Amino acid sequence: MGNNKYIEYELTSDILCIGERVKKGTFKPCVKTIPFSSITGSLRDAFNMPNLYALGKFDPDYLDSIEQFRQVHIYSPRYVFEDVAKVPLQIEFLTEVKAQVYIFLTGEAPESFIEKKENREFDITMGAFKSKGFGRCHLSFVRIIENPEINTGRLLSRIPENYMSYFGIRRVIKPVYGYLFEPTSKVSGKYIRALFEGSLIEGYDFLVKEEINK
C-alpha cells in the first residue's frame, strides 16, 4: 500500500451539481466533496478504462468559502403521459468550482499514462443536469504523488469500503458511513457502504485534514 502512486489533477467547473442521495423532500442539497463514484464513473467513460479509480476533494480555500458559490435551480419534472408538472424540486449546485482529483491505476504506470498529451489536460462531464449544461469539468495534470505520508485526520472525500486500500486508508478510527452508487451494468447498479467526509482515519496526507488536537 505504501508503494502506490497517484496522478493529481486540478479540476475546475463553471457549474456543477452532485446531489446528496435524498429519498424524500423537494430540496436536494449538493455534496461538499468529489465522491469516488462520481469522478471514477466520469473518468472511466472518458478513457474507457475499467482499471481506473479516482476520488477528489474541493480546494481548501474554495471549501472555506463554499457558501458564496451555492445556488439553487428550480426543476419541475413532468409525468410522461399526462404532460403534467410534478411538485417542483429545488436543486442546489455550485459555481466556479475548484478541486483536486487523484487517480489510481491498476495495470498501468502513471508515468506512461501521462506521457500521452491528451491525458495531461482534458474535459469530462460529471454530476446531474448534463443536458442543461451543468457538469462540464476541465482537468489539468499537476504531479505524480509517490510515497505519500500517513497522517491521522478527517477524510476529505467519499470512498466505498472495498476500495479504501487503493487510497491508503490504513485505519478507520471514527467512521461516518453512507452509501454510494456502484454500476453493475450500463443500465443497473447497487448502493454500497462507503466512508464519508468527516470520518476520522489514518491515511494518506492528501486525503485528510489533520486534527489540531489529537
Annotate each language-model stretch with its function:
Residues 1-214:
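Conserved active-site/ligand-binding neighborhood in enzyme cores
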